[in-house]
UniProtKB/Swiss-Prot annotation:
This is P protein. Residues 194-325, 370-381, 439-501, 639, 697-718, 781-810 are extracellular. It catalyses: chloride(in) = chloride(out). Its main location: membrane. Pfam families: CitMHS (PF03600). GO terms for biological process: cell population proliferation; developmental pigmentation; lysosomal lumen pH elevation; melanin biosynthetic process; melanin biosynthetic process from tyrosine; melanocyte differentiation; pigmentation; spermatid development. It comes from the Eukaryota. One of its GO terms (molecular function) is chloride channel activity. It comes from Mus musculus. One of its GO terms (cellular component) is endosome membrane. Keywords: Albinism, Glycoprotein, Membrane, Transmembrane, Transmembrane helix, Transport.
Amino acid sequence: MRLENKDIRLASAVLEVELHQTSALSVPTCPDPGRLLTVKPATSNYKLGQADPCIPYAGEAAGKSVCVPEHTEFGSFLVKGSSSLKDLSFKEDTPLLWNSSQKKRSQLMPVHHPEFIATEGSWENGLTAWEQKCMLGKEVADLSALASSEKRDLAGSVHLRAQVSKLGCCVRWIKITGLFVFVVLCSILFSLYPDQGKFWQLLAVSPLENYSVNLSGHADSMILQLDLAGALMAGGPSGSGKEEHVVVVVTQTDAAGNRRRRPQQLTYNWTVLLNPRSEHVVVSRTFEIVSREAVSISIQASLQQTRLVPLLLAHQFLGASVEAQVASAVAILAGVYTLIIFEIVHRTLAAMLGALAALAALAVVGDRPSLTHVVEWIDFETLALLFGMMILVAVFSETGFFDYCAVKAYQLSRGRVWAMIFMLCLMAAILSAFLDNVTTMLLFTPVTIRLCEVLNLDPRQVLIAEVIFTNIGGAATAIGDPPNVIIVSNQELRKMGLDFAGFTAHMFLGICLVLLVSFPLLRLLYWNKKLYNKEPSEIVELKHEIHVWRLTAQRISPASREETAVRGLLLEKVLALEHLLAQRLHTFHRQISQEDKNWETNIQELQRKHRISDRSLLVKCLTVLGFVISMFFLNSFVPGIHLDLGWIAILGAIWLLILADIHDFEIILHRVEWATLLFFAALFVLMEALTHLHLVEYVGEQTALLIKMVPEDQRFAAAIVLIVWVSALASSLIDNIPFTATMIPVLLNLSQDPEISLPALPLMYALALGACLGGNGTLIGASTNVVCAGIAEKHGYGFSFMEFFRLGFPVMLMSCTIGMCYLLIAHIVVGWN
């Protein structure tokens, strides 16, 4: 701000007051700040930068006393390096119209002093100047008040941030304390109850000779669990009763009570089919204990020929009812989902906590498993498949093939983003119909991430879309998804005429209809979502680079001086990149349209930047990967290949490691998603423990009861609707593999019940459709979802439970609705049974 005297005679004295952002420098005023006069006589000998003395005078023209500062006290405050500037001690909260008399006693001089006498015209000009100065003083005062208000707001904001930080620390402390207490409590409960173990007893039964035993010592028990092992089949007998089977009769005497004068004898019959292939199968059944009387068990075989049938029998008394065990299982499952949904802990740790809680619950009810038994619950075939394919993909990424595929996909889409997403989703759905879903996403995820980085897209949204269509496509064939494999492999269903071709024919048509509806629905769900990043690609890549550098620094454990030095260098690199990012954010601003108009020019630039880096390694990788995929496909048709998917993936990884001649093996191991593998191991233990707590069995039995309650003329349609939706909702919450394995015998018993007489195959199609499509409901509903999320997180693009849920759950609802309508038309209207 510049204050000048308009009088020509006083033009020689110019006083400049610069208002800076950090300090406010103002001229001193009289006790009456209503009028301000800053003048300097031309005849004065004052140096430039000094002010006149000021003496009080009752100005007649002005009506009030006006003053100017005396130079001896105010000093040369504009001279650079002057000590007067230090004496003034201006601060950020110093008012612009600062009274110098508050700091020092200033002498005042009347304005009617001879040296200040001027002509009438100049005096009028002075009055005008005074009015302007008064207006200026008021504005400056307003600015000072505004600055003070902003500082108060800033202080309030700082105080609010401090309160939020303190609250965050309290919440974090409560979380850690609560989880630690929970873990300690579960550990104590698990350690208090010993491992009872199962004592198997060998016995032989025949049509002419049965086996009987009396059990006692169950004073505090509520449930009797019987385990039968041998050449058995998990399923009830058909209505004809011609199959060979074993009948287990459990009898107990209920003592006389208040309502009964005589004791009552309770009898339970359990029929188990014999397997002609003599496979070793373990089946279990629970029976309620109604009294403290001894329990009698009798086993007899019903055979077409007289022969002995060897069996193994084990029994165990449990201290909690089935309802109590189911309630505890539901509470544990709800707790695990709460930890994952709200991201209280990492999903791997959440699965481990859930597994520990389930094991503690089993220990309390008297069914604590041994460590060997718990390890047997882990599906090592799935883990071997994941590990082998991760090794293959890690070596494959060294060739630059993923970058090349990304550029080709961009070229085929001609710069249209949604055309490219449509092609990626369609390719993923088709490939997953003939390969395992996990294998499909292990191959597609790196390509998609690199493609999105090239096009400045958000990879999270595209990856979620691919996962959804991978799960949909996997339901089309008998080998696309594990539930389908379990259903087709069942021997009882094979006897009913279920084969690969028939199953695929039924499922393929329904999945095609689901795909046709799911694509428009996905586009509708993405309608208001910005697929492009809001910032330029340079900024996005720089942020991602900072994130990767920081993760790398955090993963280095400072065990030695050299590692500490390397970690320090990485952190310095992070600081340098953050400084560069701040400069880029200040410089670059651009808007990106939803369709790239200059795609042809971009293609040429991308082709120059992203090429195949190692052609010889690419040939080796393609050869091994082609062999592995071929073996995956032939494994389901050629009986001479005695290798499962896990062995094929492991052998392929070993082959490629030999051909690639990689000396630094730790680099490849660093690219393996160990957190994902550990999550699956914990999830397998959790789901198997929940199965032992009778959760899955309870859901199946309640579904069967609901179907029996429906009138007979509507029972078939109601069964299809119930099975589809129960399977879909259950598979979105728990693993669909144990659920499918448990529901198959339940549905077989339901179809073979003479009172219901429902066809079994349509029920199996409904089970397969619901179990496969239900995996899109939540992030942990299918193995494919977890694998994709783990790889994306490894690349710095992880997505949360809710991000997947907002897109996956609506697609799951719509796809299950379309699939249900297809099954109703095919089996109710058309009668394709």
